[in-house]
Curated annotation (Swiss-Prot):
Protein name stated in the entry: Transcription factor bHLH118
Keywords tagged on the record: DNA-binding, Nucleus, Transcription, Transcription regulation
GO cellular component: RNA polymerase II transcription regulator complex
Gene3D superfamilies: Helix-loop-helix DNA-binding domain
Molecular functions (GO terms): DNA-binding transcription factor activity; DNA-binding transcription factor activity, RNA polymerase II-specific; protein dimerization activity; RNA polymerase II transcription regulatory region sequence-specific DNA binding
Record localization: Nucleus
Main localization (coarse): nucleus
Domain bHLH: 1-53
Quaternary state and interactors: Homodimer.
Listed GO biological process terms: regulation of DNA-templated transcription; regulation of transcription by RNA polymerase II
Length: 163
């Protein structure tokens, strides 16, 4: 009798685990479980997917914070004119090709920005400009041969203090 009870409990446990693993598989994108048969591979795929999502969340939060910093000070400040009179705003972060520079410059000619980048040994590969709250937001991707040789803090200070 005791063996039958134990056997039945074990059978239910296996069925429940199979159901849970099937549910896990249904939640994961195919590229994270493709070709993986064992449950340990599926769990590892789930862990990788969670890590992937966490990195994406950090990247998106960082971009949101940068955009709020560059364009949304008027949300935090009651005096919008104060925001418009503030100096240039610069955010520099690593990207696949080197670094990404997001900046909002007031009266600085854009050619001066390009000159500073050239002086720091950066080669612009991509550029996007958009208008947010009547300010231009410039986003540049620059190739960097050796990131260790570039003083990002100095570059940020130089771009921020440009007139």
């Amino acid at each position: 009798m005791e063996k039958l009870v134990h056997k039945e409990i074990e059978k239910r446990r296996r069925q429940e685990m199979a159901s849970l693993y099937a549910s896990l598989r249904s939640l994961l994108p195919l590229e994270f479980i493709q070709g993986k048969r064992s449950t340990s591979d599926q769990v590892k795929g789930a862990v990788n997917y969670i890590d992937y999502l966490q990195r994406n969340i950090k990247d998106i939060n960082s971009k949101r914070d940068d955009l709020v910093l560059l364009s949304g000070r008027s949300f935090r400040s009651s005096n919008e004119q104060e925001w418009n009179e503030i100096s240039n705003h610069v955010v520099i972060r690593p990207c696949l090709v080197g670094i990404e520079i997001v900046l909002s410059i007031l009266q600085t000619p854009f050619s001066s920005v390009l000159q500073v980048l050239r002086e720091h040994g950066l080669y612009v590969l991509g550029y996007i400009c958009s208008s947010v709250n009547d300010r231009l937001i410039h986003t540049l991707q620059a190739e960097v041969n050796d990131l260790a040789l570039i003083d990002l803090a100095d570059l940020k200070d130089t771009l921020t203090l440009m007139k």
